[in-house]
Amino acid sequence: MATRRILKELKELQRDPPVSCSAGPTGEDMFHWQATIMGPNESPYSGGVFLVNIHFPPDYPFKPPKVVFRTKVFHPNINSNGNICLDILKDQWSPALTISKVLLSICSLLTDPNPDDPLVPEIAHIYKTDKTKYEAMARSWTQKYALF
């Protein structure tokens, strides 16, 4: 079941890729993908290229994929290990969701962080109290870690 669904999503992604994202298997293993997310223009991540690993569980799509940033990013919902705090990757997951929708949700999270459900409280505090400083730090990290 999982392999068929993953192949279907891969074909859809190749036919109709989401804006500023791409994804596909890293090798022969269909359960391990790498994705590329371009930093959204209207965000401090603009110009950055962010690499993301995607690991599908054997019971996909009934369980969410594990999605982890490989590129360091200064963000209240993404920690230093690359883990992402995003509801659809946890309790709000639905088998109706696809990797394409997950990637678009991550792009949206880059544009609009959720400081009320942070993975990194210190960054959430900066975001809430000094947005200019937050944006400068996010831009700085993007230039340091996400430019190719």
UniProtKB/Swiss-Prot annotation:
<keyword id="KW-0547">Nucleotide-binding</keyword>
<comment type="similarity">
    <text>Belongs to the ubiquitin-conjugating enzyme family.</text>
</comment>
<dbReference type="InterPro" id="IPR023313">
    <property type="entry name" value="UBQ-conjugating_AS"/>
</dbReference>
<feature type="active site" description="Glycyl thioester intermediate">
    <location>
        <position position="85"/>
    </location>
</feature>
<keyword id="KW-0067">ATP-binding</keyword>
<dbReference type="GO" id="GO:0016567">
    <property type="term" value="P:protein ubiquitination"/>
</dbReference>
<dbReference type="GO" id="GO:0005524">
    <property type="term" value="F:ATP binding"/>
</dbReference>
<dbReference type="Pfam" id="PF00179">
    <property type="entry name" value="UQ_con"/>
</dbReference>
<dbReference type="InterPro" id="IPR000608">
    <property type="entry name" value="UBQ-conjugat_E2_core"/>
</dbReference>
<comment type="pathway">
    <text>Protein modification; protein ubiquitination.</text>
</comment>
<dbReference type="GO" id="GO:0006511">
    <property type="term" value="P:ubiquitin-dependent protein catabolic process"/>
</dbReference>
<comment type="function">
    <text>Accepts the ubiquitin from the E1 complex and catalyzes its covalent attachment to other proteins.</text>
</comment>
<dbReference type="GO" id="GO:0061631">
    <property type="term" value="F:ubiquitin conjugating enzyme activity"/>
</dbReference>
<keyword id="KW-0833">Ubl conjugation pathway</keyword>
<dbReference type="GO" id="GO:0004842">
    <property type="term" value="F:ubiquitin-protein transferase activity"/>
</dbReference>
<keyword id="KW-0808">Transferase</keyword>
<feature type="domain" description="UBC core">
    <location>
        <begin position="1"/>
        <end position="147"/>
    </location>
</feature>
<protein>
    <recommendedName>
        <fullName>Ubiquitin-conjugating enzyme E2 29</fullName>
        <ecNumber>2.3.2.23</ecNumber>
    </recommendedName>
</protein>
<dbReference type="InterPro" id="IPR016135">
    <property type="entry name" value="UBQ-conjugating_enzyme/RWD"/>
</dbReference>
